[in-house]
Every structure is written in structure tokens, then in C-alpha cells.
Amino acid sequence: MNIQALLSEKVRQAMIAAGAPADCEPQVRQSAKVQFGDYQANGMMAVAKKLGMAPRQLAEQVLTHLDLNGIASKVEIAGPGFINIFLDPAFLAEHVQQALASDRLGVATPEKQTIVVDYSAPNVAKEMHVGHLRSTIIGDAAVRTLEFLGHKVIRANHVGDWGTQFGMLIAWLEKQQQENAGEMELADLEGFYRDAKKHYDEDEEFAERARNYVVKLQSGDEYFREMWRKLVDITMTQNQITYDRLNVTLTRDDVMGESLYNPMLPGIVADLKAKGLAVESEGATVVFLDEFKNKEGEPMGVIIQKKDGGYLYTTTDIACAKYRYETLHADRVLYYIDSRQHQHLMQAWAIVRKAGYVPESVPLEHHMFGMMLGKDGKPFKTRAGGTVKLADLLDEALERARRLVAEKNPDMPADELEKLANAVGIGAVKYADLSKNRTTDYIFDWDNMLAFEGNTAPYMQYAYTRVLSVFRKAEIDEEQLAAAPVIIREDREAQLAARLLQFEETLTVVAREGTPHVMCAYLYDLAGLFSGFYEHCPILSAENEEVRNSRLKLAQLTAKTLKLGLDTLGIETVERM
């Protein structure tokens, strides 16, 4: 149920009947304050100006054509021409019933699209670090939301599995007796990478062999391809452990690494030359883009093939976008890549559009994100100044959560404690990130993220268990409750019901903007409204059974909405805390 969309269409039709153009925007928004109703239509200002009318005069005319019978109990004009809409309690009650009768809580499915989501993208032969956290969990929350809305989502894990470093790694692997490679763990590979690089820098004979191996690998020699595959397999097996711990939905089947696009690169360079988009410049092949200027104010040159014949990331990203449209048949492509890559992507996509590889009707969207910072406001590092491994971060989260849970539940059985600590610890790390606007940097703070107050995972998980506890105390028969009517008489009942029915609107924003923090804010607000409702509207000690059952149904929909909302974020819920 998308009340905002329903009201938008009703107000738009009334505006047209009042003389507004057919493409007018009613600008229906959820009201910020209860005294302004549940929704507010703010579109009169812009339209009245075009019509040469006072906004309030237009609003009055719109009201004469606006039929919200059975939807709103009151509609009023406020200020210079805002239209405040107060939803009818009977309308709210009816749609709460409908939401409870649906597995999807009444959420409709929009027109199905094929959406490619590019996220996570770790490098082969390196362990995942905290820099991979944001892309991985924000991208996964977007994927979960889009899939819930019924879209066909293709996860694209664009791993760094190609490049000149593989000659060096294969040469070192060979030197270390390659037959043991399959048993190596990634922790070994971290040191393995450093040792290989050290030898490459210090031993010219080794470096020469590594350079030859790159050529053989790139020419498709089966022995070197097999060695390369071992490195990829070891890395992705280890990364899968991290993905599973993080409760993200990526698997090995979602890997679409840089190597996938290699066969396309010569053809793309040749095609861009044939189209007159790419030219030779100082031995390299370059595309000059008018949209980007260099320091002299001239069109910026983007190299797509180096003087030595090598290709660049831009060339790969051009091929990647082309593949996603032509082969995967994407209607929309989302890239969860940090903000530092923005200009690079914009340049690659400008070339893609000019070449006609992806039509303008297919959006290529950079859902960029800021950095994770330490308490000092600098990039998050170990005490020694090194990069924090993601596995180490999750280990610490689990250990801190274990202590926290044991402190609050000293008699809890060990296996139950471990399960709860995992849900709280991993949930806390994810939620702390997801609850911040992805476009900004944020401070990583253990104390804040593990607090049981405020917009945190532990608070949200506790809020869910608190609602469930009402049902345990009620000892209610599910069938009996299902048949009971919902009655909304109190203001707090109406406020909670209206917020519950805004779940679909929240999902729609997350799907459109790729902003999971909007869902976090919604769920936090919902938990707060339930708390006020619970305090002021007695459930178990209600004046009669009809009111008791009605309030239990509001509590039931709250629990279902919290659980489903947290699930779209990849946050685990628990039955007891």
C-alpha cells in the first residue's frame, strides 16, 4: 500500500481540474509534524506562479475538486497554500487488516526490471579489509530491497582478478611449490603477496620471469591460467567465509571479475577508433571528452590503450557497461563504489553513451559512499597505522557483543549466548554503517554502535523482542486474533497505524535512491511510536476484549514490519534478548 502515490494521483487530478497543466507535480510528502496531518501537498506554490494565481487561491480551487472520501477524515489549507491531509481512522484500520493478511505486508510489486548491482569487489590474493565493508553491506541492502520488490537482480562482484601483478604472484607460487597452493589460506596469501612483491623489487631475474609470465597468462597458456585460477579460488573461498559472517547474499556464482571483459577490449578500442571517438596521441589511444576539461581548459584526454598496448581500468569499465546492457539485458545498473572513483566512472560512461553501447534510457548510477573514519576523524586504521582486516573487525565485534550479552544474561546457556552475540555484534557493525547517509564519511565508534539506546542494532533488535513479549504474555490464539477487527480511536493508535502503512513508501525510496539509512530511520521512528503507543494505550489491560485484540493486531503488524525491514538491511532478529 503506497498512500503517498494514491494521494499524489488524487491531488494531481484535482489540480488539473482546477486548471493546472497535465504534468503538474502535487509534491505530496509525509508531514513532519502531527498538527499538519499525515500528508501535505506542497505543489501549489510552483503551479500557482505559472498560472498567475495566489497559491492559496489555487489550493481552494483544488479542494473543490479533491475527492478523498473514505481516505481522509479532514483536509485543510495551511499557510500560503499547503494542503494538509488527515487520514481517516477507518481507512487506516482497513489497510492494517489487509497488511496483516499479506505475507508481503500489503507491499505491491512495481513493474519488474532487470537490475545489475555492482558491489563488494575485493582484490584477488589480498584479504578483505574495512574499506570493503561499506560497498558490501550497502550494496547488499539495496539488492535485498530490490528483490523483495520483485525485480530480477543480478549481483556483480567485480573482483580485481587481473593485471600485471599476477605474473609476480604466479612466479612466486611456482617457487613455493605450487602443488600446496590449494591448501593455502588467505592469511598465508597476505604474507605471500608481500614476499612476492619484495622479490620482484629486489631480484631482477625474478622480475623478468614475472614479466614473461604475465605475457603467457594473457596469451591464454593453460598452465598459467590454472595457476591463476588457484589464486582466485583460494581468495574467493576465504571471502565467502566473510560474506557468510556478514549475512550478505553474495556467492561465488556472483563473481564477474575484471578478467571477464579482457576478450572484449581489443574490439572496443578498434570500434571507438572506427567511430572517430578514439585517436592516436603520443603513441597511446585516447578519447577526448568535451565534458571534462584539463588545467588549460581543453577537452580532457582519457587513455583507453597505452603506448605498450596495455589497457586501463577505463577500458574495462567501458566493456563492463556494454556487457551489462547487451548480454545481461540490464534495465538499470547500480555501482556501489566509493566517491573517489566518481570522475573515472563518469568519463567511462560518457564514452559508453557516445559510442551508443548503452542507451540513455538505461540508467548507469554511481551510488557513491564516504569513508569510515576512526574517532580521530582520520581513515580507520590499526593502532600501528595499518589497514584493519575485515575478519579482525568482525572478531572484535563478536567478542564485545559476547561480553555485553553475558553481562545482561549471566545465566544464558553458552550456545544461545553465542547465537545472540553473533546477531548483536555483526548487526551492530552493519547497522552503524547502514544508518548513516552513505554519501557522508562516518566515525566508527564501538560504544555507540553497541548501545541499547538510540538508532542502533541492539536497540532495534530489543524493540522487536519487546513487541514479541506482548504476545507471549497475551497467550492469544492466532486464528481468533486474525478474525478480530482493527478499531482505531486513539491518536497514538492512528499515528502508529499510519506509520506502519508507510513501509512501502520507505522501500520505494531505498530502491530508487540506494539509501538504506532511510529504512533505518523509518524503523527507529516506528519503534519509538510503538513505545509511546504501548505506554499510553494499554494492550493486555485494555477496557475490553475488542480493544485488546485490535491493539494486539497493531503490535503484530509492528513486529512483522520491524522484522521484514531489518531483513531488507541484512540485520538478524532474535526472539529473546
Swiss-Prot record:
Localization terms from the record: Cytoplasm
Family: Belongs to the class-I aminoacyl-tRNA synthetase family.
PANTHER family per UniProt: ARGININE--TRNA LIGASE, CYTOPLASMIC (PTHR11956:SF5), ARGINYL-TRNA SYNTHETASE (PTHR11956)
Annotated protein name in UniProt: Arginine--tRNA ligase
EC number: 6.1.1.19
GO cellular component assignments: cytosol
Subunit structure: Monomer.
Taxonomic superkingdom: Bacteria
MF term (GO), any: arginine-tRNA ligase activity
Chief subcellular location: cytoplasm
Keyword Ligase: yes
Catalytic activity: tRNA(Arg) + L-arginine + ATP = L-arginyl-tRNA(Arg) + AMP + diphosphate
Organism lineage: Bacteria, Pseudomonadati, Pseudomonadota, Gammaproteobacteria, Enterobacterales
Record keywords, A-Z: Aminoacyl-tRNA synthetase, ATP-binding, Cytoplasm, Ligase, Nucleotide-binding, Protein biosynthesis
Positions of short motif 'HIGH' region: 122-132
GO biological process: arginyl-tRNA aminoacylation
UniProt keyword Secreted, yes or no: no
Biological source species: Escherichia coli (strain K12)
TM segment ranges: none
HAMAP family from the UniProt entry: Arg_tRNA_synth
Enzyme class: ligase
